[in-house]
Each structure stands twice: as C-alpha cells, then as structure tokens.
Curated annotation (Swiss-Prot):
Protein family membership: Belongs to the BLOC1S1 family.
Subunit note: Component of the biogenesis of lysosome-related organelles complex-1 (BLOC-1) composed of at least BLI1, BLS1, CNL1, KXD1, SNN1 and VAB2.
Annotated compartments: Endosome
Biological role: Component of the biogenesis of lysosome-related organelles complex-1 (BLOC-1), a complex involved in endosomal cargo sorting.
Keywords in alphabetical order: Endosome, Phosphoprotein, Transport
Protein name: Biogenesis of lysosome-related organelles complex 1 subunit BLS1
Length: 122
C-alpha cells in the first residue's frame, strides 16, 4: 500500500493534537500531583519568587527609579526655574525698551531726512 502526501498530512493532523493533549494532561498531572514531586516543588518556588518579585522588589525598583528621575531631571529643572524666573520679566522689559529705542531712532531718522529735504529745497 502506497501512502500519498495527503494521507500523511491527514495522519499528522489527526495524531498530533492527541499527543499534545496527552502531554498537557501529563504535565498537569505532574504539577498538580498531591504528592510533592521535584517539579511541583520547583513550580511552588517559582510562584513564591514571582510573588516576592512583584510585591517587594518591583516596588523598591520603582521607588528607586522615581528618586533617581527626580534627582537627575526634576530637581535641576526646578532649580533653573527658580534661578532664572526673575530674569524673565526683565527680558520682557528689555524687549519693550528695545522696541521703543528702535521707534525713536526711526523718528529721528525721518526727522533728519525731512530737515535735509527742506534745506535742499530752499
């Protein structure tokens, strides 16, 4: 009897889920066994470690990161803000004064041009 490709594929499809289900069943049996096996002890230790990591170490890490972030970023920015805030109002005043000086210079230039024009016309 010759096997065709489609027959082989069908056999694999039919047989593989059964093996997968069997492996899952055996793994559950080992892990959930009422008898303390090495696998169940290891699983229990992993679960305990995961709980410790999430409840203790992760909180400490987040707190450490927050403190580090505050010291490296937030505190220097607050310091610069407090240091240079008084100058911000001063720079606005300088800008207004520069605009007034520029306007006065244009008025003086126009006045000078009008005086020169009147002199030349006489």
């Amino acid at each position: 009897m010759f096997l065709t490709f489609s027959m082989c594929v069908n056999w694999i499809i039919v047989k593989m889920p059964n093996r997968s289900e069997e492996l899952d069943r055996l793994l559950d049996k080992i892990i959930n066994s009422p008898h303390r096996t090495e696998a169940s002890k290891t699983l229990q230790e992993i679960e305990n470690n995961q709980s410790y990591i999430l409840n203790v170490q992760l909180k400490k890490l987040l707190r450490l990161h927050d403190d580090s972030f505050k010291n490296k970023c937030v505190s220097p920015i607050n310091y610069m803000l407090e240091k240079y805030t008084p100058y911000m109002g001063h720079t606005e005043a300088l800008q207004k004064e520069a605009e007034l000086v520029d306007r006065d210079l244009r008025i003086l230039e126009m006045t000078y041009q009008l005086i020169e024009k009147n002199r030349n016309s006489k």
